[in-house]
């Protein structure tokens, strides 16, 4: 970790505990700052709070007292999930107190260069593939950070200059960056999402675009050339642009030609030998190849990863084949586009489990993708909205309380050869703490179903 002096004896407020807040508070304390942590949940729901108190860090739990900001803080580090229209954040900005997220701190202390990956969909899978490719190369090693793995600042604290940090970044994290500068930035794609957090689509796009705002001509921007919006934005960057495309041959960058994965004019390997299923994963693969080639990973090392990588948990994850039915867990599908992508990947009839937090979407965009859906099982706040679209498509719709209740209904409505797919098209927070918890609940329910039927 770089021993920076800029926070020594500075008063710092960390808003929100969770993993990133604990990491930021601990590191700031080590850097000599006077740290206060504030979380809305009570002490009884914050097991990390006691550990911070034992380090000598002040902790206030149970509410966000607005008067706390009158205590002369010189910096606020906010949890990414706290929106900028939160009264605490609005007051901090009014008082001209800088507000950052934990990834900014990670960059400031990191000795290792950062490969930062963002996008509406595919960023977790892309980050993971890049991580594996860099670790497959004898001269590189990678640490996984950000929304996947460990908090960015915790990873940066222990990273060395001969490593890379493969860092997944959300728009929530990027919106507040000031000096953050990855050596390589990746934007997988941009679609409409998180409009409950951002004021409009323009703000969302700009938050994603912040990933490259401090890059120079010595840095690289890997970007989806199939999206005109992103293509046009590249005119504004100082970084070297490396495009990727699933639809066209490129003079430089990564693309597909004659069944082969290409980079510039070089054949990397056959697409048929790639283990990861689904058309939607091709973007992720091409973006990863562009990063790997830029950092000197060989074709053999790249293909070894692509021939062995089975995917990431909760992302179109194959769970089990039982009684002729294949169960898939796509709990990470927290928006409509992700569910569209999942449905496109299956040719067999699908029993779809969907629903979750209501962010104001109509779900009409799912209609063209329901051709292979034979039965729809809905739950959560959006059950009625998604169910309405299913009825328009002429699909039989079943309403249940939650994911656990959906599994036996899905089995009853399916037949040998069918796909049973959890792909909610919604965030989990109306019923489950995270999409991982929701996905695990689904897989546990499958295990219970099998045990019950086979008694």
Swiss-Prot record:
Molecular-function GO term, any one: UDP-N-acetylmuramoylalanine-D-glutamate ligase activity
The record, for Gene3D superfamilies, names: Mur ligase, C-terminal domain, Mur-like, catalytic domain, NAD(P)-binding Rossmann-like Domain
Residues given in the record as ATP binding sites: 119-125
The record ties this protein, via Pfam families, to: Mur_ligase_C, Mur_ligase_M, MurD-like_N
**UniProt pathway annotation:** Cell wall biogenesis; peptidoglycan biosynthesis
What InterPro entries would the database entry show? Folylpolyglutamate_synth_CS, Mur-like_cat_sf, Mur_ligase_C, Mur_ligase_C_dom_sf, Mur_ligase_cen, MurD
| Function, in words | Cell wall formation. Catalyzes the addition of glutamate to the nucleotide precursor UDP-N-acetylmuramoyl-L-alanine (UMA).
Q: What is this protein called?
A: UDP-N-acetylmuramoylalanine--D-glutamate ligase
Q: Which organism is it from?
A: Listeria innocua serovar 6a (strain ATCC BAA-680 / CLIP 11262)
- Gene name of this polypeptide: murD
